[in-house]
A protein has these predicted regions:
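Small cysteine-rich, disulfide-bonded extracellular modules of the LU/uPAR three-finger superfamily
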Residues: 1-151, 159-200
Length: 200
């Protein structure tokens, strides 16, 4: 009789966006996983392909529409297709703390968290947009137009030496303006859980 393993993997993500100095929380929610891209990146990582790991956190301003009366409608996260991307990426920050291109690996980093005996492991990502970044941002968080740095979407991007990394996750949220008078920190958790279904 052929043995068939019924176990599998479940992946879920969660973001917390807040001011690291005042502790004001701007967003706290789950995100969509791009399972095709994630499966490819997992295989590339454990297969030592030299790419595939989490590398950047991308930010964009194309995730919502605001009508003339101020009502906000939210677009569907992009979680299918090999060419998936943010709707309109306007900024990205390297969060791979082993990369020589990471300008602040103490505050922009990736940690692996696991408790012995548990069937899940967390990838905990920290990304800080401090007061002076991005460059060319407005001085105050009172913009009335859709500037490049009024973020309403973000996603994790995998590493690829060609610079064309894959979108691994995508989350859309209420617009948050990044300006000189405001720092924004993102705590991003990806939980990878083994689903033990036994064998037949």
């Amino acid at each position: 009789m052929q043995v068939k393993d019924l176990s599998g993997l479940h992946i879920e993500g969660h973001i917390k966006v807040y001011d690291p100095y005042s502790s004001e929380i701007y967003e706290d929610k789950r995100n969509a996983i791009h399972y095709e891209s994630f499966s490819m990146s997992l295989a590339e990582s454990i297969g030592n392909a030299g790419h595939g790991w989490i590398y950047q956190l991308a930010f964009g301003n194309g995730g919502t529409n605001v009508d003339p009366t101020g009502i906000i409608s939210y677009l569907t996260p992009n979680s299918t297709g090999t060419n998936a991307s943010l709707y309109n990426q306007t900024y990205a920050k390297i969060i791979d703390d082993k990369s020589v291109l990471n300008t602040d690996p103490i505050r922009n980093k990736i940690e692996i968290r696991h408790l012995t005996g548990k069937n899940y492991t967390d990838v905990f990502i920290t990304c800080l947009l401090d007061f002076g970044e991005p460059s060319n941002q407005l001085a105050f968080d009172n913009a009335t137009n859709n500037s490049d740095f009024i973020f309403d979407e973000m996603g994790l991007i995998s590493y690829n030496p060609t610079g064309q990394g894959r979108l691994l996750t995508h989350v859309i949220f209420h617009p948050i303006q990044k300006s000189l008078n405001r720092a924004i920190q993102v705590d991003y958790t990806i939980r990878i859980q083994s689903l033990s279904g036994g064998i037949i």
